[in-house]
Curated annotation (Swiss-Prot):
Belongs to the somatotropin/prolactin family. It comes from Oncorhynchus keta (Chum salmon). GO terms for molecular function: hormone activity; prolactin receptor binding; superoxide-generating NADPH oxidase activator activity. This is Prolactin-2. Keywords: Disulfide bond, Hormone, Secreted, Signal. The keyword Secreted applies.
């Protein structure tokens, strides 16, 4: 019941945003998107902490490097200073491309979480579903934003996800699950950073305060 209620609230929030989008200014839409991305990143950070609590000792050694994340091929600003020099259209395109690239991986994580060999797999599974809800909600909000910003902001880079199996043994499943979540946390931070820069520009805040 709680799960259904939360999903309904998110759906209603998106519906209200769609219905009233023409009456809402760009800066307000940016603020709403920034709030969603902040929640997405906070939730992914919480999930990584849950996974860390029962991570095998050899996990850090065996876990793939961040450069192996499937989104690493996307050319993006490395820090805030670089992001501040990127155009609004490119930043929104990067944020949407990263978010869209996680649709399939989140489906995989959602299907694997209930049977993950981890004592908190129930909580982890619930949080993964929340991630999916917030990701969908944020994506819908960004679609509204780009419609306001114009055609030049609507380009999306296609980033294929070739993974579909976390492994057969317990250690491999935990390591690969944790690796995917660490990649998502990294990308959710980037999305959040890009949207905060866009919010600052929309509200005409000084760059150093972004």
């Amino acid at each position: 019941m709680a799960r259904r209620s939360q999903g309904t609230k998110l759906h209603l929030a998106v519906l209200c945003l769609v219905v009233s989008c023409h009456a809402i200014g760009l800066s307000d839409l940016m603020e709403r998107a920034s709030q969603r991305s902040d929640k997405l990143h906070s939730l992914s950070t919480s999930l990584n902490k849950d996974l860390d609590s029962h991570f095998p000792p050899m996990g850090r050694v065996m876990m793939p490097r961040p450069s192996m994340c499937h989104t690493s091929s996307l050319q993006i600003p490395k820090d805030k200073e670089q992001a501040l020099r990127v155009s609004e259209n490119e930043l929104i395109s990067l944020a949407r491309s990263l978010l869209l690239a996680w649709n399939d991986p989140l489906l995989l994580l959602s299907s694997e979480a209930p049977t993950l060999p981890h004592p908190s797999n129930g909580d982890i599974s619930s949080k993964i579903r929340e991630l999916q809800d917030y990701s969908k909600s944020l994506g819908d909000g960004l679609d509204i934003l780009v419609n306001k910003m114009g055609p030049s902001s609507q380009y999306i880079s296609s980033i294929p996800f070739k993974g579909g199996d976390l492994g057969n043994d317990k250690t491999s499943r935990l390591i690969n699950f944790h690796f995917l979540m660490s990649c998502f946390r990294r990308d959710s931070h980037k999305i959040d950073s890009f949207l905060k820069v866009l919010r600052c520009r929309a509200t005409k805040m000084r760059p150093e305060t972004c």
